[in-house]
Curated annotation (Swiss-Prot):
<dbReference type="Pfam" id="PF08541">
    <property type="entry name" value="ACP_syn_III_C"/>
</dbReference>
<comment type="subunit">
    <text>Homodimer.</text>
</comment>
<keyword id="KW-0012">Acyltransferase</keyword>
<dbReference type="InterPro" id="IPR013751">
    <property type="entry name" value="ACP_syn_III_N"/>
</dbReference>
<protein>
    <recommendedName>
        <fullName>Beta-ketoacyl-[acyl-carrier-protein] synthase III</fullName>
        <ecNumber>2.3.1.180</ecNumber>
    </recommendedName>
</protein>
<comment type="similarity">
    <text>Belongs to the thiolase-like superfamily. FabH family.</text>
</comment>
<keyword id="KW-0276">Fatty acid metabolism</keyword>
<keyword id="KW-0511">Multifunctional enzyme</keyword>
<dbReference type="InterPro" id="IPR016039">
    <property type="entry name" value="Thiolase-like"/>
</dbReference>
<keyword id="KW-0444">Lipid biosynthesis</keyword>
<dbReference type="InterPro" id="IPR004655">
    <property type="entry name" value="FabH"/>
</dbReference>
<dbReference type="GO" id="GO:0005737">
    <property type="term" value="C:cytoplasm"/>
</dbReference>
<comment type="function">
    <text>Catalyzes the condensation reaction of fatty acid synthesis by the addition to an acyl acceptor of two carbons from malonyl-ACP. Catalyzes the first condensation reaction which initiates fatty acid synthesis and may therefore play a role in governing the total rate of fatty acid production. Possesses both acetoacetyl-ACP synthase and acetyl transacylase activities. Its substrate specificity determines the biosynthesis of branched-chain and/or straight-chain of fatty acids.</text>
</comment>
<feature type="region of interest" description="ACP-binding">
    <location>
        <begin position="251"/>
        <end position="255"/>
    </location>
</feature>
<feature type="active site">
    <location>
        <position position="112"/>
    </location>
</feature>
<dbReference type="GO" id="GO:0004315">
    <property type="term" value="F:3-oxoacyl-[acyl-carrier-protein] synthase activity"/>
</dbReference>
<dbReference type="GO" id="GO:0033818">
    <property type="term" value="F:beta-ketoacyl-acyl-carrier-protein synthase III activity"/>
</dbReference>
Length: 325
């Protein structure tokens, strides 16, 4: 059998750091108010780089660190809800910039669950035997869709990108078990870049494209539905919650992670966290955490670590993959 394996991980964030104190100068907020409610201290905000620029820097790191000829890359998937444009896709822009001339490339839109959904897809592409090597990236520049006058959302988000290189060299399944979910009926609780009908033949007025969020509804969704998804995936894997080495969850809010750890009966320090430095980077949050963990020696990519990856957010979407890293 053919098994996919993650062989490289990389991340990139803009140099410009915006602290809670910086935000207090442009809106009615302060460090204590933000940190006590979210666990966020800083976020990196782009001053000129677009989503494809961030993603390209990640892809170049993955290729350079692996020594792989970019022409041997079979596919590139970029998970994002803040693309440079709808056409061409962010992934197509990355493909051109890194010289992956033989790769097919496309964007996947699943908000904060995007990286987990994309990794699941990539694993199937490789384990099918049809493709040997691919790149999966989560990349966001949320600063371009935020309403900077709305303190309820502006304090939460940051910009960044991260990803992994996969190939067919695995000696065991990459994904032990998974469960992906969507509930479009609740999709209106988190909206961004809404594109209304605008033609000479329609009388519909244009509505703004800034991000809007029903904070309480999203918080309740995260603490009620997501732990059930993780538990169901654990049951499919025949693993107990404490048998997992680390939990890498979407970095939305430290209080959400506190509640999830308690509901699952898992030691809180198994839930890795870096939102204090990056804020909520949507599809980029899980791979940034993964890449940082490898860089900092928390775990390596030797196939010996069992990790839960869980994303949750707009769509509504949520999903878990238990993987051998």
């Amino acid at each position: 059998m053919t098994f996919a394996k993650i062989t490289q991980a990389a991340h990139y964030v803009p140099e410009n750091v915006v602290s809670n104190d910086d935000l207090s100068k442009i809106m009615d907020t302060n460090d204590e108010w933000i940190y006590s409610r979210t666990g966020i201290k800083n976020r990196h905000i782009s001053t000129g780089e677009n989503t494809s620029d961030l993603a390209t820097k990640v892809a170049k790191q993955l290729i350079e660190n692996s020594g792989v000829d970019p022409e041997l890359i079979d596919f590139i998937i970029v998970a994002t809800v803040t693309p440079d444009s709808m056409m061409p896709s962010t992934a197509a822009r990355v493909q051109a910039q890194v010289g992956a001339t033989n790769a097919f490339a496309y964007d996947l839109t699943a908000a904060c669950s995007g990286f987990v959904f994309a990794l699941s897809t990539a694993e199937k592409l490789i384990s099918s035997g049809a493709y040997q090597r691919g790149i999966v990236i989560g990349a966001e520049v949320f600063s371009k869709v935020i309403d900077w006058s709305d303190r309820s959302t502006a304090v939460l988000f940051g910009d960044g990108a991260a990803g992994v290189l996969l190939d067919n060299s695995g000696s065991q399944p990459l994904i032990i078990a998974e469960k992906m979910q969507t509930d479009g009926k609740r999709g209106g609780s988190l909206l961004s870049s809404y594109a209304d009908i605008q033609t000479p033949f329609a009388s519909v007025s244009y509505e703004g494209s800034n991000l809007s969020m029903e904070g309480r509804a999203i918080f309740d969704f995260a603490v009620r539905d997501v732990p059930k998804n993780i538990q169901a995936t654990l049951e499919k894997s025949d693993l107990a919650a404490e048998e997992i080495d680390y939990y890498l969850l979407h970095q939305a809010n430290s209080r959400i992670l506190d509640k999830m750890a308690k509901k699952l009966g898992v030691t809180r320090n198994k839930f890795l966290q870096n939102m204090q430095e990056y804020g909520n980077t949507s599809a980029a949050s899980i791979p940034i955490l993964l890449s940082e963990s490898v860089k900092n020696g928390i775990f390596s990519l030797d196939g010996q670590t069992k990790v839960v990856l869980t994303g949750f957010g707009g769509g509504l979407t949520w999903g878990t993959a238990i993987i051998n890293l």
